[in-house]
Amino acid sequence: MAAGLEIRRARPEELPACADLYVRVLCETFTWQPPERHRREDFLQAARSEEVYVAVEDGRILGLAAFYRPQNFLHSLYVDVRNRGIGKRLLDHVSAVASGPVSLKVQAPNKLAQLFYEREGFTCVERGQDPGSDVAWLRLVREPDSPA
């Protein structure tokens, strides 16, 4: 676990760096999609209506979580450095500020994310496919008192 790691709300001036992290991690992770599909503008647009939390260590943003409070929906969770507990810390923070069960969607080919969320107490409640997409998704939910 990252001891010197701070989880907090992103400052407005940090959103461009968050958008860069978002695009970089998407391009590395979502290899089944063309890189040009992942755009900074998409993140910045979504961030206008979401709460963006960051994991910061030594002034560097190592991860982010974008949370849409009206639906307790975790829209994005991306980390720059894996296997340090950063994703778990961000996820736990979002769960702590949520007003009920947190839900999210994960693309079916993203097996590492599915394993991570299942390990953190999420269960699959729905499977589907967005219109115009050939990639299936799973909607996962974690109840507030789920052991993680």
Predicted features along the sequence, with ranges:
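Conserved GNAT acetyl-CoA-binding A-motif
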Residues: 97-109
